[in-house]
From Swiss-Prot:
UniProt entry tagged with the keyword RNA-binding: yes
Molecular function terms, GO-annotated: rRNA binding; structural constituent of ribosome
Protein task: One of the early assembly proteins it binds 23S rRNA. One of the proteins that surrounds the polypeptide exit tunnel on the outside of the ribosome. Forms the main docking site for trigger factor binding to the ribosome.
GO cellular component: ribonucleoprotein complex; ribosome
Domain of life of the source: Bacteria
Biological process, per Gene Ontology: translation
Keywords: Ribonucleoprotein, Ribosomal protein, RNA-binding, rRNA-binding
Record-linked InterPro entries: Nucleotide-bd_a/b_plait_sf, Ribosomal_uL23-like, Ribosomal_uL23/eL15/eS24_sf, Ribosomal_uL23_CS
Protein's name according to its UniProt entry: Large ribosomal subunit protein uL23
Organism from which the protein derives: Mesoplasma florum (strain ATCC 33453 / NBRC 100688 / NCTC 11704 / L1) (Acholeplasma florum)
Phylogenetic lineage: Bacteria, Bacillati, Mycoplasmatota, Mollicutes, Entomoplasmatales
Similarity annotation: Belongs to the universal ribosomal protein uL23 family.
Subunit annotation: Part of the 50S ribosomal subunit. Contacts protein L29, and trigger factor when it is bound to the ribosome.
Amino acid sequence: MHLTEVIKKPVLTEKSFLGHANGVYTFLVDRRANKVQIKKTFEEIFEVKVESVRTMNYDGKEKRMGRFVGKTNNYKKAIITLKDGETLDILSDL
């Protein structure tokens, strides 16, 4: 898997913003990526040192449109904790 395919986008919620002061960032990642790949990709792209990576798999929700039943996509979320003194400047403008 290529480096640019692992990390999809940041999760921009009120709860995820509370962790930014402590060096904790939340990103949506590819479902096939493991913790080692996520850590390596994050350190190479953003040039920071990662302390830990926690991941969660989510199943898509069932959605209905009249009598038709569909489902949203499954996704994986990674909570990335940076080492002390490290910050991520890409989200500081928000």
